[in-house]
């Protein structure tokens, strides 16, 4: 896990290390269960990822929303379905998000003052929870 700055910032609430995923990076794994949740960071440097599960159509998830002038931990429901073995593929996108238009008006001022802060399009993940 290679993001010591984020890991330190959230160490009191998450005694885990955060993995930083850049454009076109990701991982693939299988699990046995009926539900999968991933804890991630939403924030100004957040991007977009594609998640594929089994033979389902890929779907996009964002690590960015209207409040992302600061970083915060969020759980993301990756899968909920039949109990069994499932294959998950997670890959960061290289597409650019129009972050200013997503931010709430009260957070757009920060974007205007600090545009470089919003340039990265990364994903930060720290742990997966599997429910059987």
PLM region spans:
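Glycan-recognition surfaces in beta-rich domains, encompassing non-catalytic CBMs
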Residues: 1-132
